[in-house]
């Protein structure tokens, strides 16, 4: 076998050198990629740890908030029960006072005529008694002689009470 020509040897050497350079370059890139992956893995692990801590804190905060809300709910329910009892008591009081309110409304409806009657009685008191006169001659506009079917008691009462109205207002 004959020796390969020098050109082939140089080409083969150049090719081997290029392969070695390429291998070294790839190894350098692989090392860089491994460092990058390792750094990313560390960052991800740290980030995962931070997220787990935040998630744990959120869980504790949620539990605290649930406890607070349960306490508020119990307080609100107690308040509702208290208010319902108060409403029931007031409803009972209203039921008891309703007849009295109706009576007062009836009194208020009757007040104006009663006030008119009291004014008329006061006017009668102001006028005073009739002057004494002869029973045979009644004053004009006054009561007339006793009727035929009268018992005469009315005349006796008029004789005993000379005032028109014997009341004071």
UniProtKB/Swiss-Prot annotation:
Cell compartment(s), UniProt: Cytoplasm
Coiled-coil ranges (or none): 7-89
Biased composition (Pro residues): 136-146
Organism superkingdom: Eukaryota
S-S pairs: none
Cellular component GO terms held in the UniProt record: cytoplasm; type III intermediate filament
Ranges of biased composition (kind: Low complexity): 126-135
Chain residue ranges for the region called Disordered: 126-169
Keyword Coiled coil in annotation: yes
Keywords: Coiled coil, Cytoplasm
Main location: cytoplasm
Protein name: Vimentin-type intermediate filament-associated coiled-coil protein
Organism: Homo sapiens (Human)
